[in-house]
Amino acid sequence: MLTLFSQSRRGPITLRMFLIAAIISITPETFAQDFDWAPDYPVGSTIPLLEAQDQNGELQTLKTLSGENGILLMFNRSFDWCPYCKAQLEGLEEAKHAFSTLGLNIVTITYDPIETLKLVEEDMKVSFTLLHDKNIKHVNAYNILNTDYEPGHFAYGVPQPGIMFVNPDGKIIAKFAEENFRQRPDWSDVAEALIIP
């Protein structure tokens, strides 16, 4: 805790000293956004589930997907019709080296059918795992369903998009998201913010 006025042999703290101390005491939480994505699973908790088929129809789990330090898990609306998701995916392909050097494998998950994910892989030349969230079981398990859409709407089942850094044991190390789905975290900011425990 920062003390504004300190009585000591040196006398009261000066304004300059106070400003320096204030700057040093600022933590990342000071700048944290009010929006809390996936609030049921805060940083430090364990993910509830990760088991889904990839773009090749092969069943994947956290164990099969993890790099040395875990995975970067990205929940998206759709790579079929969502332009913001497509742009984010393209940016991730360009930024993938920054995460691979951190020992992280990249994993994305959407409700898109496996056939669509395979086309996305080929058309966008994606070189990492695209998972199909069958029956939106992951979106429901993580409690990140976008409730703007009713059952029967083509977009029903999409999540509030976001990113998790998950270690090989399933522990959430960091989360990144924006409240407005049209805005996505910048990949360079995400890479700079990641600290490997």
Regions found by a protein language model. Name each.
Residues 86-136:
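Structural microenvironment flanking redox-active thiols in thiol-disulfide oxidoreductases
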Residues 154-197:
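Thiol-/selenol-based redox modules, centered on thioredoxin-like
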Residues 1-12:
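N-terminal secretory signal peptides that target proteins for export/translocation
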Residues 65-86, 90:
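Short active-site neighborhood of thiol/selenol oxidoreductases, capturing the structured segment around
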